[in-house]
Amino acid sequence: MELTPREKDKLLLFTAALVAERRLARGVTLNYPESVALISAFIMEGARDGQTVAELMEAGRHVLTRAQVMEGVPEMIPDIQVEATFPDGSKLVTVHNPIV
């Protein structure tokens, strides 16, 4: 199986998001990379499911709470930008203040 660099990046991101989901399920607070991966994967999957950019910008703010991440992580992530594949092509989704 041959994968492009972009496809490899997506798989790595998705794998990191799976690790983050498992840690959350065990009650472990997430660090910076895990938090970014989980929110980014949520956006990418939402795009594939047909949600709009506006819907994902709002929904992305409700994936994680301050209680679910390590101290200082929300301040380290002022926004997250993800290039997601929608049914009508790729678009950039920006989520401002993703952890409330």
From Swiss-Prot:
One GO BP on record is: urea catabolic process
Could you tell me what this protein is called?
A: Urease subunit gamma
Q: What does the similarity note say?
A: Belongs to the urease gamma subunit family.
Q: Native species of this protein?
A: Enterobacter sp. (strain 638)
Query: Tell me, what's a Pfam family for it?
Result: Urease_gamma
This entry's Gene Ontology molecular function terms read:
nickel cation binding; urease activity
Q: Which GO terms describe its cellular component?
A: cytoplasm
Matching InterPro entries, A to Z? Urease_gamma, Urease_gamma/gamma-beta_su, Urease_gamma_sf, Urease_subunit
Q: Which Gene3D superfamilies match?
A: Urease, gamma-like subunit
